[in-house]
Amino acid sequence: MEDKNINSKSVETSRRRFLKASAAVAATAGVLGVSSVSGLLASTAKLSISTNNLPIKVAGYKIDRVDALIDGRVQIEGCDMQFEIASIGDMNTNVFSGPQSYDVTEIGLHPYMLAYANDGFRGYSMIPVFPLRLFRHKSIFIRTDRGIKKPEDLRGKKVATPGFSSTSLTWLRGIVQHEYGVKPEEIQWVISSKDSSAKAAGKASKQESVIPQGLSVSNGPVGKDESDLLESGEVDALFHAAEPRAYVEGHPKVARLFSDFRKTERDYFAKTGIFPIMHAVAIRNDIIEQNPWLPKAVFNAYSQAKELMYDHLKKMAWVTTSLPWIAQEIEETRALMGENFWPYGIAANRKALETLFQYSYEQGLASRKLTIEELFHPSTMNLEEAQV
């Protein structure tokens, strides 16, 4: 009887140990997102392989088309990625005159063009991923008491700008010239010493302050930002990439030149097919030389992240966005611009890129007219996204 009790206790102890061990295995499998012991073993093998991945540091804005990279839903194949949220001025400065601590980084398209053409910069190569694009008609602000009703009325006027050669300002001058016939030399430019949006944009790189020959350009008073100049009447209008303080605060004599800028910008796209590009993605060339597969892997990851954004917009944007008519906005955008209205790749963006190359050269900013083939890594020339 005593032996039977001992055996029963031993069996019970063994059973408990087995159940405890099984629970531990199941818990570990759950953490790894697998549903079986065999899945756990496979995941463990995968984890051990991942130690051979390339560690890379990526920088960019926190924006919906990149969110899946930031939160880890999308990974760059073959890489262990660390994503750092940064502002464009700081990213530009890091690349052109700083420590180049980012292996992959969002970059201002026009500052990169100027660094490449004018300064012989070759530290990074761009890939045809464009995290930020923006129609720019909305970015012209005026004093309402200066008789400015249309772009042609800017002739002879004083127009303030924070900086001069940023991507946004280069697009703006080009659009005003080619769509409305007002050349940069017909305007009196005043560069403000401060920018009311500097906290959001970060420190401007030197490539954003290139002043060409042959224009009427003066510096605004020290200590005054662009909004001070517009509010005081020292200038008649303002070109600004963001929303200037004077407009945000509702100054009674400050307005947009195009009050219905949505219609104006939609008409511009219908006419030209151009969705202006502001930022691209660039990769350090020494990293590419050692890992020639990386440009394609980065392109694919950004494309996958954008696909998740599209899917969210179609299904759930009305939940996560505070705009009450967001669903109609999405539908109308797709009707005008297509399902993939934010395209990556060279083919879909060739016209927009070459238009900015033209604007930069004819405005006296880039020392020569650049080409797509020299600015973008050769391995990315024919990369295409999966169909939306």
Mark where each language-model region is:
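N-terminal export signals
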Residues: 17-40
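Pocket-lining segment of extracytoplasmic ligand-binding domains
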Residues: 197-314
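Secondary-structure end/capping motifs
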Residues: 282, 287-362
